[in-house]
Amino acid sequence: MLYLVGLGLSDETDITVKGLEVVKKAERVYLEAYTSILLVDQATLESYYGRPIVVADREMVESNSDEILRDADKVDVAFCVVGDPFGATTHTDLVLRARELGIQVRTVPNASIMSGIGAAGLQLYNFGQTVSMVFFLDNWRPASFYDRIKENRSIGLHTLVLLDIKVKEQSLENMARGRKIYEPPRYMTVGTCAQQMLEIEEEKQEGVYGPESLAIGCARVGGKTEKFVSGTLKELCDADDLLGPPLHSLILLGRRTHELEHDFVREFAVNKENWDRIWKAEYCGKQ
């Protein structure tokens, strides 16, 4: 059987009891290592789980899934995913391939950023579509997130923005030459995300959000050093030092925000007076 095991958001102890039982009995244990990261290293996981772990990069999962699924019709294979197993479509694809091979699949869920983000103080049912922000290049500045934020904002909903992770990526030159040389890992920060959002608004000029739109920067959600910083998008452009190391994400507030949410989030504000002023003018009582 193929088990998809969620590992939670932070460290080795976030795995569920059921998930740990699966990992301990499985013939092989894989760790998906490119859609997100835990805040501890592979050796720490192996020590806690009492099992060797094979790191599965994007190439293995997307191009060599037969190795992961090898003999899974006869033995148990654990495919471990940071957060919840179905936070990325790649894992749906792995399940579909397993089904084609007649392999049974079972999921062991866990907390993900989609649920853990509630710690920022906003009600989860007031979130709209989640969007992703990738690193801009000189000749590539994808802005599909903008229209989704526009839809969310039109009905007063918050937007969770998930930030880019570059792990085991190749430069165009190395890719073209077929060289297995990889760039150092890169993790987008809230500051970069906020700046890129404002650049796209400057281009679009549709007033979906602006420098004084309220937002929350989130760092290491679910971990011991979890951190939230709230302020305007302009303020968050310079908030990386306050937030600290990765992983980061960002929430753009919608106008359907309750007073209790305001009071909760206000405690994270870079400038409480500025936060109160904008809240009263643009958010309080608005839909």
UniProtKB/Swiss-Prot annotation:
Intracellular or extracellular location(s): Cytoplasm
Binding-site positions, S-adenosyl-L-methionine: 9, 84, 87, 112-113, 163, 221, 248
Reaction it catalyzes: 2-[(3S)-amino-3-carboxypropyl]-L-histidyl-[translation elongation factor 2] + 4 S-adenosyl-L-methionine = diphthine methyl ester-[translation elongation factor 2] + 4 S-adenosyl-L-homocysteine + 3 H(+)
Record keywords, A-Z: Cytoplasm, Methyltransferase, S-adenosyl-L-methionine, Transferase
GO biological process: methylation; protein histidyl modification to diphthamide
Regions that span the bilayer: none
GO cellular component: cytoplasm
Similarity comment text for this entry: Belongs to the diphthine synthase family.
UniProt-recorded name of the protein: Diphthine methyl ester synthase
